[in-house]
Amino acid sequence: VAPKTEAAFAACVDLLRDAADWPEPEVLRRQAEDRITAATPAAAVWKYFTENPPLTSAGHMRRLEAAQAVSPKDVQRLASESWRTATFKPADEQEFLNRYGTSLTPDDNIARFDRIMREGRPQVAKDMLSKLPPTYQPLASARLAMATRAADTVQILRGVAPAQLDTPAVRLERLQWLRRTGNL
């Protein structure tokens, strides 16, 4: 099989199974996820994703669709997991939120924000602000201000409850901010 294949989903899955030593299996897994169509049996998709966690935003969406058909009790857990761990293409993210947004908790949104910040993507994290619980938004704004070296960072930090600032992640962000701004 060439690095880029037009093989159907089932053929990609068969190759993954039969050629366990295939170099860069992630390439085949991504291609398998891209090959899932509306005609692909939900049970086959579900089986695939129970053995291979999704790698793409489309894969996360197809896994959730299969779960709705085959194992509805898992949809909320998988939606939470996907939201916390996946990076979605903009169109997939909107579709995900339209379909599964009501399954998400405030903790899911905080976890996603935290992950995006750890990945060093404050501009993407900024888009999460409105989804965060009101009690967390001042801290999120302060973290964004530190990450982007905003001129009013000190003022924004003063608006955050001291208890919220006393977590390992926030202390690390403060130290990094102080170092970047030459104040450490």
What is the predicted function of each stretch?
Residues V1-L184:
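Alpha-helical solenoid repeat scaffolds
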